[in-house]
């Protein structure tokens, strides 16, 4: 930095920069936000804008009118942005030697977006706070754009990481002490998520401070009433998060909801590996592609409905009543196609009620936002009017009276506002003329001043009988009425004399003075009036804030159910029986994603029938590409859909609720952690063995393949035996394997059944049937797969020769067998 004495304006900048810390500071100067020193260099490099100098100080700037787009670009690159505003109008600073007053007013970080193109419409944007006390990890997350505030505690790192990955935050907050001691947590999370790390003071995570912060914000003397008694680490994380937003980032927090415990006792748990392996939200090999379960199920019309669908997909229910309530509601709409069409029409007109309410609460809403709220309430009212008279299933009971209760607010907004509204209050033309008596007069004055003067002149000529009276204007007097001196006595007594001339007299009236005042300040008066009216209207809206948020949840629920009903109607899904039994029976089941990617009717359906008293484990053998992996994933996906309350692609199904789903399906090398593919495989399998229960579903694909044949086989068989015979671990297990030796377990254990992916040979070449059939496979057809993969023909020929030798009775070399089998078990 320069050694010259800073100017008064740069002193302001230094004060703001000290407060901004590591954030990139945008400093308002007239019509631009300027950056100085290192911030200017960063701004120039990352936004491709000019870097200049003033008095040796590097500087660059962006226009106020387009600042939001530039901020989005900075945040998308991982920057935190601090914004210093002018808090004094230029006209109020005339004659003063000091610069305009400025202060740091807000920060923008990835986890605190509100008005941004980066904010995902149908996904939450969470910031997460984590802390540890003793053996417990405290966890709190908040969606600043909706105000949703959740917290929980975990007794192990794995569950904490899984929950954070499930929520997919864009920013994580903790203190230096935690990061130094537990940075492996962040490293593991960063393998799955792109996020920003933020640090806050250690003292903010202390229990006394955190408790006081939360109690003060929610105006309570104790947090016990929120169900938080004894949750010390979670309270510490939540209090620090609230303080970080309010005290560090200077953000409004009035809209933040009462914190809720984010428990998993009534949800089907899906760990991070399974969420990825099953491609619930994002395809593994094509992140922008269409082969995720979310993409297939996504039929929602509203942002709130989309977020609810996404959240339920990774947190299905483990509560029979909740599942049945939604199934009944889906069936109700499924049988009423015209009703679905009408609902879809109105739902598509509903904007993001949650985020609109947040913008109004935080005083960041503009006229267009209020217009979107009005239109959304109008569409929601139609939805309530359509559904409330119908014989609705229990899920919908009592929901649609909420919308009708907002009729008076909708009427107010409809009468108060113009149809088309501007982005900014300063653009004007927000309120209709009838909303306030001064609006019509001021607008008329502004737009029809000359006509008004002619009409007024005619009116007072008629009133006084003085036909030669004139209305004139001068820089000194402003507007005045002039008559010849001999006619002045004819004017009414309420005419106010302004000036006497040699042969004329000049007057004014209260009405003309009012017109003059209006004309001289009409634009300012209009803006001031509409600004105040806008604030008043927002205050009236916020009186109904809770009702609007309740309506938002009703709309989300309706949209969610409609989405599932539309999906079921489009593909002819069946309603599964979901209960507390131990059954897993699906007839004619199809992979919900693969089914949509193939021509209709070409996907081969398959069955499954499991019950702990009979079959707890199915071993599936057969060649690669024959459908084993698709089948085992399919079963897991159908269970997830069923426990969301959705219908599923099958002819019939009876599913006893599953409490946890675990998958061990492939793995990429984790070189940054020094973990090989095999180590990842073993770590994931260990997690399954430790955490599975009798009511879990385990999907295993080729466990043990990453080491020597005998080591792998030994591990695989040991895993199988552990899951079959260990009390509390007797989960339903689907195990796809090339180890034919495992299939012998069927002869020794009544709870194991062998199945295989069907193949028919035609002229020595396999034809994959994509059917899962009883019994084990006789051949792997690995060389055929290598041929399909494009191996040179000489390599294929040599492999066939070696295979014939190995399959012959003369081959007894254990070493040769082990090496070659390892190669063919891909």
From Swiss-Prot:
SMART domains: MUTSac, MUTSd. GO terms for cellular component: cytosol. PROSITE patterns: DNA_MISMATCH_REPAIR_2 (PS00486). The gene is mutS. Belongs to the DNA mismatch repair MutS family. Keywords: ATP-binding, DNA damage, DNA repair, DNA-binding, Nucleotide-binding. This is DNA mismatch repair protein MutS. One of its GO terms (biological process) is mismatch repair. It comes from the Bacteria. The keyword DNA repair applies. This protein is involved in the repair of mismatches in DNA. It is possible that it carries out the mismatch recognition step. This protein has a weak ATPase activity. ATP binds at residues 622-629. GO terms for molecular function: ATP binding; ATP-dependent DNA damage sensor activity; damaged DNA binding; mismatched DNA binding.
């Amino acid at each position: 930095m320069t050694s010259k004495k800073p100017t008064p304006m740069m002193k302001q900048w230094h004060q703001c920069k000290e407060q901004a810390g590591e954030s990139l500071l945008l400093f308002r100067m007239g019509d631009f936000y300027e950056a100085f020193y290192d911030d200017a260099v960063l701004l120039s490099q990352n936004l491709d804008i000019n870097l200049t100098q003033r008095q040796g100080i590097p500087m660059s700037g962006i226009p106020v009118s387009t600042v939001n787009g530039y901020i989005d670009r900075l945040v998308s690159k991982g920057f935190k942005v601090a914004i210093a505003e002018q808090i004094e109008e230029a006209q109020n600073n005339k004659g003063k030697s000091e610069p305009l007053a400025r202060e740091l007013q807000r920060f923008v970080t990835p986890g605190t977006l509100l008005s941004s193109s980066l904010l995902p419409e149908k996904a939450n944007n969470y910031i997460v706070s984590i802390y540890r006390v003793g053996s417990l990890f405290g966890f709190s997350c908040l969606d600043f754009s909706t105000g949703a505030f959740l917290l929980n505690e975990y007794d192990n790192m794995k569950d904490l990481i899984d929950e954070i990955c499930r929520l997919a935050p864009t920013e994580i907050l903790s203190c230096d002490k935690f990061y130094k001691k537990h940075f492996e947590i962040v490293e593991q999370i960063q393998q799955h998520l792109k996020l920003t790390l933020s640090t806050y003071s250690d003292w903010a995570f202390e229990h006394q401070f955190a408790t006081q912060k939360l109690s003060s914000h929610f105006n309570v003397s104790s947090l016990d009433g929120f169900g938080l008694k004894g949750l010390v680490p979670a309270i510490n994380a939540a209090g620090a998060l609230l303080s970080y937003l309010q005290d560090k980032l200077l953000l409004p927090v009035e809209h933040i909801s009462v914190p809720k415990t984010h428990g998993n006792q009534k949800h089907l748990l899906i760990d991070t590996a399974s969420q990825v392996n099953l491609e619930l939200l994002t395809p593994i090999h094509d992140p922008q592609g269409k082969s995720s379960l979310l993409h297939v199920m996504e039929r929602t019309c509203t942002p709130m409905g989309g977020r609810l669908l996404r959240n339920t997909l990774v947190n299905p229910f483990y509560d029979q009543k909740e599942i049945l309530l939604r199934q009944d509601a889906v069936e109700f709409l499924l049988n009423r196609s015209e009703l679905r069409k009408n609902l879809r029409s109105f739902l598509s007109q509903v904007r993001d009620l949650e985020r609109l309410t947040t913008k109004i609460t935080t005083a960041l809403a503009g006229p267009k936002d209020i217009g979107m709220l009005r239109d959304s309430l109008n569409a929601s009212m139609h939805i309530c009017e359509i559904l409330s008279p119908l014989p609705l299933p229990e899920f919908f009971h009592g929901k649609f009276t909420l919308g009708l209760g907002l009729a008076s607010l909708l009427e107010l907004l409809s009468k108060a506002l113009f149809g088309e509204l501007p982005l900014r209050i300063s653009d004007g033309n927000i309120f209709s003329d009838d909303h306030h008596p001064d609006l019509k007069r001021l607008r008329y004055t502004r737009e029809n001043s000359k006509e008004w003067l002619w009409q007024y002149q005619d009116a007072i000529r008629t009133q006084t009988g003085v036909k030669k009276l004139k209305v004139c204007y001068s820089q000194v007097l402003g507007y005045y009425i002039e008559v010849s001196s001999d006619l002045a006595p004819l004017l009414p007594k309420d005419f106010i004399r302004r000036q006497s001339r040699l042969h004329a007299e000049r007057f004014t009236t209260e009405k003309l003075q009012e017109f003059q005042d209006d004309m001289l300040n009409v634009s300012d008066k209009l803006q001031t009036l509409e600004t105040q009216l806008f604030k008043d209207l927002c205050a009236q809206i916020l009186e109904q804030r809770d009702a609007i948020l309740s309506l938002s949840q009703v709309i989300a629920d309706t949209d969610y159910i409609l989405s599932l009903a539309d999906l079921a109607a489009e593909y002819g899904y069946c309603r599964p029986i979901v209960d507390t039994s131990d059954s897993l029976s699906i007839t004619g089941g199809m992979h919900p994603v693969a089914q949509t990617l193939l021509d209709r009717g070409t996907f081969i359906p398959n069955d499954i029938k499991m019950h702990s008293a009979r079959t707890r484990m199915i071993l599936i053998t057969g060649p690669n590409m024959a459908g084993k992996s698709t089948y085992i994933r399919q079963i897991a996906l159908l269970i997830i859909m069923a426990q969301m309350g959705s219908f599923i692609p099958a002819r019939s199904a009876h599913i006893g609720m599953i409490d946890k789903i675990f998958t061990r399906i492939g793995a990429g090398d984790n070189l940054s952690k020094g973990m090989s593919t095999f180590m990842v495989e073993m770590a994931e399998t260990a997690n399954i063995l430790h955490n599975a229960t009798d009511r879990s579903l385990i999907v295993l694909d080729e466990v043990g393949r990453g080491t020597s044949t005998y080591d792998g086989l030994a591990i695989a068989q040991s895993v199988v035996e552990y899951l079959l015979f260990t009390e509390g671990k007797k989960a339903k297990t689907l195990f796809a394997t090339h180890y034919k030796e495992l299939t012998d377990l069927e002869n020794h254990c009544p709870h194991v059944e062998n199945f295989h992916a069907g193949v028919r040979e035609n002229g020595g070449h396999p034809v994959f049937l994509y059917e899962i059939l009883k019994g084990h496979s006789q051949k792997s057809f690995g060389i055929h797969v290598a041929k399909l993969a494009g191996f040179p023909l000489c390599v294929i020929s040599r492999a066939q020769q070696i295979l014939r030798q190995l399959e012959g009775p003369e081959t007894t070399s254990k070493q040769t067998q082990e090496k070659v089998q390892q190669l063919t078990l891909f």
